[in-house]
């Protein structure tokens, strides 16, 4: 999982889901797990 300042580019990928857990924003992508990231 990558830590990124901006998740905007990852949100646009096919299969991407934006999830908020305990105030932290994650992008999870089951189609292409390379694009898994958390905002930091």
UniProtKB/Swiss-Prot annotation:
Name of the gene: rpmJ2
Stated family: Belongs to the bacterial ribosomal protein bL36 family.
UniProt keyword Protease present: no
Sorted UniProt keywords: Ribonucleoprotein, Ribosomal protein
Listed InterPro entries: Ribosomal_bL36, Ribosomal_bL36_sp, Ribosomal_L36_bact
GO biological process, one term: translation
Protein name: Large ribosomal subunit protein bL36B
Coiled coil: none
A Pfam family recorded for this sequence: Ribosomal_L36
Biological classification of the source: Bacteria, Bacillati, Actinomycetota, Actinomycetes, Kitasatosporales
GO cellular component: ribonucleoprotein complex; ribosome
Domain of life: Bacteria
GO molecular function, one term: structural constituent of ribosome
């Amino acid at each position: 999982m990558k830590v990124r300042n901006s998740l905007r580019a990852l949100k646009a990928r096919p299969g991407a889901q934006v999830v908020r857990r305990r105030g932290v924003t994650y992008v999870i992508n089951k189609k292409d797990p390379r694009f898994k990231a958390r905002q930091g």
